[in-house]
Curated annotation (Swiss-Prot):
GO terms for biological process: DNA recombination; DNA repair; DNA replication. A motif (Important for interaction with partner proteins) lies at residues 145-150. Keywords: DNA damage, DNA recombination, DNA repair, DNA replication, DNA-binding. One of its GO terms (cellular component) is nucleoid. This is Single-stranded DNA-binding protein. It comes from Caldanaerobacter subterraneus subsp. tengcongensis (strain DSM 15242 / JCM 11007 / NBRC 100824 / MB4) (Thermoanaerobacter tengcongensis). Plays an important role in DNA replication, recombination and repair. Binds to ssDNA and to an array of partner proteins to recruit them to their sites of action during DNA metabolism. The lineage of its organism: Bacteria, Bacillati, Bacillota, Clostridia, Thermoanaerobacterales. The gene is ssb.
Length: 150
C-alpha cells in the first residue's frame, strides 16, 4: 500500500510550534493549494490542507516559515479522532510532513509580488532544459555491454 502526498502551496498564516509532554517539538500550519482546474467563474478553487511537522523539521519550519511563503511538502495523510472537554468527538485529516522545501528565497519573500515570483521560478526551471535537443527521447543506447558497471 502507498500513502504519499506531494503538495505545493502557500502558508495561510504563520506556523505554530508546541511541545508534547515529552518535550518533542511539533509545528502545524495550513497550506493553500490550488486545484488543477478553472471553475466556471474563471478561478481555481483552493483547498486548505493542515500540515504537521515533528522534531527537527518542526523547529526548522517554525523558525523559517511565515504566512504567504511558497513551499513544497512531501508526506503522508493521517486521520485521527479526539474528544473535546464536552465529550464531542472530532475527526481530523492532515498531512504529516517528511520534508518541507522552501521554494523562494527568504530575502525576496514578502515583497507582495507572489505571482511574479512564481513566474520567475517557472522560468528558472524551464532554463534547466534549454540545452536538451527537441528530438531527444530520453534514451541513449549502449553500444557494448562491456560499458555496464555491473
Amino acid at each position: 500500500m502507498l500513502n504519499k502526498v506531494i503538495l505545493i502551496g502557500r502558508l495561510t498564516k504563520d506556523p505554530v510550534m508546541r511541545y508534547t509532554s515529552d518535550m518533542v517539538p511539533v509545528t502545524t500550519f495550513t497550506l493553500a493549494v490550488n486545484r488543477n482546474y478553472v471553475s466556471q467563474s474563471g478561478e481555481r478553487p483552493t483547498d486548505f490542507i493542515p500540515i504537521v511537522t515533528w522534531r527537527k523539521l518542526a523547529e526548522i519550519c517554525a523558525n523559517n516559515l511565515k504566512k504567504g511563503r511558497l513551499v513544497a511538502v512531501t508526506g503522508s495523510i493521517q486521520t485521527r479522532t479526539w474528544d473535546d472537554s464536552s465529550g464531542n468527538r472530532h475527526w481530523v485529516t492532515e498531512v504529516v510532513a517528511d520534508d518541507v522545501r522552501f521554494l523562494e528565497p527568504k530575502s525576496g519573500f514578502g515583497s507582495g509580488s507572489a505571482p511574479e515570483e512564481e513566474k520567475e521560478l517557472d522560468e528558472d526551471f524551464d532554463k534547466l532544459f534549454e540545452d536538451i535537443p527537441d528530438d531527444f527521447d530520453g534514451f541513449t543506447p549502449i553500444e557494448s555491454e562491456d560499458d555496464l558497471p555491473f
